[in-house]
Design a protein with these regions (language model features):
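Bacterial N-terminal signal peptides that target proteins for export
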Residues: 2-16
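Bacterial N-terminal signal peptides
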Residues: 13-25
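Boundary at the C-terminal end of the N-terminal hydrophobic targeting segment
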Residues: 27-29
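Histidine-rich, glycine-flanked metal-binding segment
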Residues: 31-34, 43-88, 103
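Acidic, glycine-enriched loop/beta-strand segments at the rims
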Residues: 35, 43-55, 416-427, 475-484, ...
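C-terminal cap of metal-dependent C-N hydrolases
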Residues: 41, 341, 429-435, 441, ...
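Metal-associated gating/positioning segment near the N- to mid-region
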Residues: 72, 77-150
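Active-site neighborhoods of metal-dependent hydrolases
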Residues: 156-159, 164-191, 195-218, 229, ...
Length: 567
């Protein structure tokens, strides 16, 4: 009898074991296969925490799991041994709203590891009317683009139909809504006109923009009083937006410009982002500690203010920014008329030669004409000037440098230039602040085709890898974890991108894999059209756009709509 009991007990144990195997196999079979597992990586999650070893699994465009995934079924494996696995980089200020229609892959962006861009600096891609399209016709024709949208809803629909190589969000520009109502004239809006402008901001926020922006150095933006900007920012605030600004002055009156930005934030009840924070002009070098102290004091008092930087010592803007604001009244055509008129030209020269706190006089900020390099032109006749210094152009044409500047603008008021006017210690100090993220402040471009014909600031190709190479690896002014936080979690939190910017389960799988010992920028001021190296894999929404260091051509990007979006 005891033998029978023993046999029965053994049989039961065997049956239980077999049942366990069967159930385990069934459960394993029911577990969805992962699309991709990244193994053995040094995971830097974006929060600033130290790296750790682990695997990362992706399914249906999102991060499905992080940990030991050695037993997980998958369609593909990427071995990231010795490499960093990090969140995709977020560009806090890009300019790709037009170039993404020319080459939606945006090679210059993705080879830096950029997976998301926030665009729309003051003069945004929408709203549009016939007068603006006619005024900006040369730019559209340069890129062979037909503007078949009038609103952000229509523009975003065009992007989604075409396909996008990165994720893209946009501000509605305060300059743009001003142009819609007032044109390019130096005048103040009536109450009815201001209400029209506010209505345009409301519509843009419903269309999915993330906030309202200003570029207060570039006409017609300087004509706007602070009260006008508060009114527009208030509308964006109602929809959960942010106010971002290229401030009215970044040189002698930089502290007063910060005060204006803080006032707008305070009275409109809206967060403030100061774009490409800097102290420009040799006479102002060494003043970044004052800027940092002012912002730290504001933050300590409760102001929701932060900033970003591209960490180069040269800026890049329209050549026409050297001209006093009054001369821009009426737009580019009127500016050209004034530059052709000897009397008005002499007045412009006089204003540029006189230091002033009434406007950001860039001519007073440069050490000389050798500090200006021609970067982009829309008039093909000026193409031979690309990459040349103003001093060289003036000498070869037997002109005074200021006359050479005026004559270039007469031929092409859209000319853009690189200006060497910042100090390295100021740039480094700004970069080190915990509330400073990173911006590219450039359009996405390519070394090939029509986009490769310009001579951009090297930041267009190199900002993020340059920070990893110069400021992390070589100079050690940032830790790798700090840099990745500035590239990802910090901007995601600032822009309220709640499902991006950090590596954790449930987030969209925007992921970069690179070797921290070798990643670097290649673009220089003399030869800027060079892709950065070192990004071995870049995934956007789980889809590789760079695979083993090569561009795939995939267009998995999404429009990133703001909190006020109404479908």
């Amino acid at each position: 009898m005891n033998n029978n009991i023993q046999i029965t007990s053994t049989a039961i144990r065997i049956l239980v074991f077999l049942a366990f195997l069967l159930l385990t196999s069934f459960a394993f079979a029911q577990t969805p296969s992962l699309d991709l597992v990244i193994t053995h990586g040094h995971i830097i999650d974006g929060t600033g925490s130290p790296w750790y070893s682990g695997d990362l699994g992706i399914r249906d465009g999102k991060i499905a799991a992080i940990g030991n995934l050695s037993a997980a079924p998958r369609k593909r494996t990427i071995d990231a041994a010795g490499k960093v696995v990090a969140p995709g980089f977020i560009d806090m200020l890009g300019q790709s709203e037009l170039t993404i229609l020319v080459d939606p892959r945006l090679p210059s962006k993705i080879f830096q590891g950029i997976t998301s861009e926030i665009t729309g600096e003051g003069g945004s891609i929408a709203p549009l009317n016939d007068a603006i399209i006619q005024s900006d016709r040369q730019g559209y024709e340069h890129f062979k683009i037909t503007p078949d949208w009038r609103t952000f809803r229509q523009y975003f629909a065009r992007l989604e139909k075409q396909g996008m190589g990165i994720n893209l969000a946009s501000y509605v520009g305060a300059t743009q809504v001003r142009r819609m109502v007032l044109g390019d004239d130096d005048k103040q809006p009536t109450l009815a006109q201001l209400e029209q402008m506010q209505a345009l901001v409301r519509e843009a926020m419903k269309d999915g923009t993330v906030g309202v922006s200003t570029s207060l150095e570039y006409a017609p933006a300087p004509y706007a009083k602070t009260e006008e900007l508060i009114a527009l920012a208030t509308e964006a605030s109602k929809s959960g937006g942010i106010y971002s600004t290229h401030m009215r002055d970044e040189s002698a009156s930089v502290l007063e410009a910060i005060d204006e930005a803080l006032r707008i934030g305070r009275e409109a009840h809206i967060p403030v982002e100061i774009w490409h924070i800097k102290v420009a002009g040799k006479d102002n070098w060494g003043r970044m500690p004052e800027v940092v102290a002012k912002i730290n004091a504001a933050r300590a008092a409760g102001a929701d203010v932060s900033a970003d930087t591209y960490a180069y010592t040269a800026w890049y803007n329209g050549f026409s920014a050297f001209i006093p604001p009054w001369a821009h009244d009426g737009g580019d055509a009127k500016l050209v008329e004034r530059l052709k008129d000897p009397v008005t030209r002499a007045r412009i020269r006089k204003d540029m030669l006189a230091p002033s706190k009434e406007w950001d006089n860039e001519w007073q900020e440069i050490p000389g004409p050798d500090a200006i390099m021609i970067g982009a032109v829309e008039n093909p006749a000026l193409a031979p000037l690309l990459g040349k210094r103003l001093s060289e152009i003036a000498k070869s044409s037997n002109k005074d440098p200021m006359d050479a500047l005026f004559d270039i603008l007469i031929q092409d008021p859209s000319t853009e230039v690189a200006v060497f006017g910042m100090s390295q210690p100021d740039v480094t100090l700004a970069l080190q602040q915990p509330w400073v993220a990173i911006d590219n402040d450039s359009e996405g471009t390519s070394p090939e085709g029509i986009l490769g014909q310009s001579h951009p600031h090297p930041r267009a190709y190199g900002t993020f890898p340059r920070i990893l190479a110069k400021y992390v690896r070589e100079e050690k002014v940032l830790t790798l974890e700090d840099a990745i936080r500035k590239f990802s979690a910090l901007p995601a939190q600032r822009m309220r991108l709640t499902d991006r910017g950090v590596l954790k389960a449930g987030m969209w799988a925007d992921v970069v894999i690179f070797d921290p010992a070798t990643v670097h920028d290649r673009a220089t001021f003399d030869n800027p059209n060079q892709l950065s190296e070192g990004m071995e894999y870049v995934l956007i929404n789980g889809v590789p756009v760079i695979d083993q260091g090569k561009m795939t051509g995939a267009l998995p990007g999404k429009v990133l709509r703001g909190a006020g979006y109404v479908p």
